[in-house]
Every structure is written in structure tokens, then in C-alpha cells.
């Protein structure tokens, strides 16, 4: 059974991100566009809470139900919410195209109802040596966010 979800990002940057998963064992396809980012890499994560009442701050930390250290999307030991970076060309629109095998739209660890956050700085993927590398990837301020909601198929 296919599950689809969508996230409308608001804040200093704006965008729409779509999620699609064919079944519980398939990767999640993440596609969309974010507008207003400065040229360069920007951390892109699923955060624990679907609470944006205090802007992106109330979304909490990265979604990490297993208590792992922060890492790259290709790492087996990482937060479930660690989706790495999106790259802005500086022309306004940044395309999002990710296929991820760890996040899911099914079951107790579903990302539906949680928040996507776009950060100001590059995610160092847990390898930067900064005191925040193993928790946030030292990705900086939260520029925009939105709650991931289920879609009609």
C-alpha cells in the first residue's frame, strides 16, 4: 500500500516537500523545492516533534528513537532524521531529491506528524569535530520548517 505525505515549509525560507513510500520495506522518496536559500549546502533534517508553535524551535531535536549519534544519510549509525544536506545554487529555487532507506511513513517510527527543518549552514554529517557535530551536525540556525502530513492517494 503506497503512502504519501507532504510538508509545507515556512519561515525565512519557503517550500513544499513530498514523501512517497511504496510499502514498509521500500525507501522513502523525498522530492520538492525550497526557495530563498543562500548558495551552498544546508542541513535538512526530520525533527522529533510536529510542534511549530514557537517557530522551528519547538520542533525539538533530530528524530532519533534509537539514541544514535548524528551521522550522514549513508551511515548505519545515525539519527533517523538525518537526511544530510540540500544544495542551493543561489538562483532562488533549490530542488530536493532524496531516497532514504531508514525513514518510514509506516509504523511507530513514522515521520508523519514530525517536522522537516531546513538549516542555515552545512550539516557536517557528524564528522566535523565541532562540539555539536555528533548531535546536530553543526548545521546552524533553523531557517524554515513544516509539519509532515499524510496525503490523499
Curated annotation (Swiss-Prot):
Residues that coordinate or bind Cu cation: 45, 47, 62, 119
Keyword Disulfide bond: yes
Role summary: Destroys radicals which are normally produced within the cells and which are toxic to biological systems.
Main location: cytoplasm
Cofactor comment: Binds 1 copper ion per subunit.
Keyword check for Disulfide bond: yes
Cofactor(s) needed: Cu cation; Zn(2+)
Assembly description: Homodimer.
Gene name as annotated: Sod1
UniProt name for this protein: Superoxide dismutase [Cu-Zn]
UniProt-listed InterPro entries: SOD-like_Cu/Zn_dom_sf (IPR036423), SOD_Cu/Zn_/chaperone (IPR024134), SOD_Cu/Zn_BS (IPR018152), SOD_Cu_Zn_dom (IPR001424)
Record's GO cellular component terms: cytoplasm
Reactions the enzyme catalyzes: 2 superoxide + 2 H(+) = H2O2 + O2
Entry's localization field: Cytoplasm
Keywords noted in UniProt: Antioxidant, Copper, Cytoplasm, Disulfide bond, Metal-binding, Oxidoreductase, Zinc
Family: Belongs to the Cu-Zn superoxide dismutase family.
Source organism per UniProt: Ceratitis capitata
EC numbers, comma separated: 1.15.1.1
Source species, domain of life: Eukaryota
Amino acid at each position: 500500500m503506497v503512502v504519501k505525505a507532504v510538508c509545507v515549509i515556512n519561515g525565512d525560507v519557503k517550500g513544499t516537500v513530498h514523501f512517497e513510500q511504496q510499502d514498509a520495506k521500500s525507501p522513502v522518496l523525498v522530492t520538492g523545492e525550497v526557495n530563498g536559500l543562500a548558495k551552498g549546502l544546508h542541513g535538512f533534517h526530520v525533527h522529533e516533534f510536529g510542534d511549530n508553535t514557537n517557530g522551528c524551535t519547538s520542533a525539538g531535536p533530530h528524530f532519533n528513537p534509537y539514541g544514535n549519534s548524528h551521522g550522514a544519510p549513508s551511515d548505519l549509525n545515525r539519527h533517523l532524521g538525518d537526511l544530510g544536506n540540500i544544495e542551493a545554487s543561489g538562483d532562488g529555487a533549490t530542488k530536493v531529491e532524496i531516497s532514504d532507506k531508514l525513514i518510514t511513513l509506516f509504523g511507530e517510527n513514522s515521520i508523519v506528524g514530525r517536522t522537516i527543518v531546513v538549516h542555515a549552514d552545512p550539516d557536517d554529517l557528524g564528522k566535523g569535530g565541532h562540539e555539536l557535530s555528533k548531535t546536530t551536525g553543526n548545521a546552524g540556525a533553523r531557517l524554515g520548517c513544516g509539519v509532515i502530513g499524510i496525503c490523499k492517494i
